[in-house]
């Protein structure tokens, strides 16, 4: 292993060690647009099963919406108060081989030919139906997408830590 790889390994471990779940934010500290976009890009570039990226990122800026969220955010009130950016990382529902989303990702994002898209669709459907039984319930399918979404969220949080920015994953929403 070269000296540069050792340094990189050491730096990465320091970032992971520094990252923690921040429970209270300083309202006077604002994340720059450049840093925020780097955090979002880390999420966007995250790996996912079949490259489908079954997630959506929503920046919540609307104070009225934040107030509405507080009503359902069990245990997250301090995090919602004071954070300079609130990003909702949502899992997409209904991502199947037959979905418009699957086709759009294949054609428009991945530039896959019709012939190859058909092959991928058949393979993906077999994966979901036979190997992982994801098509037996909406819940199973959503749980699969949620697991993919966590990959993006963790990469975003690690990028934030690398930039010296605190973050916290919040799951406790009642609605």
Language model features with spans:
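Acidic, surface-exposed loops and disordered segments
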Residues: 1-175
């Amino acid at each position: 292993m070269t000296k540069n790889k050792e340094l990189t390994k050491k730096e990465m471990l320091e970032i992971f060690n520094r990252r923690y779940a921040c429970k209270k934010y300083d309202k006077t500290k604002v994340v720059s647009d450049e840093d925020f976009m780097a955090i979002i890009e880390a999420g966007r570039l995250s790996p996912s099963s079949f490259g489908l990226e079954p997630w959506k990122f929503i920046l919540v800026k609307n104070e009225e919406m934040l107030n509405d969220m507080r009503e359902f955010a069990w245990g997250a009130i301090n995090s919602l108060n004071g954070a300079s950016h609130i990003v909702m990382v949502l899992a997409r529902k209904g991502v199947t081989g037959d979905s418009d989303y699957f086709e759009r990702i294949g054609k428009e994002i991945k530039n896959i030919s019709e012939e190859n898209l058909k092959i991928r669709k058949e393979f993906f459907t077999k994966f979901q139906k036979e190997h992982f039984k994801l098509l037996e319930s909406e819940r199973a399918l959503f749980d699969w997408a949620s697991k993919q979404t966590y990959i993006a969220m963790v990469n975003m949080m690690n990028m934030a830590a690398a930039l010296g920015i605190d973050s916290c994953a919040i799951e406790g929403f009642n609605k």
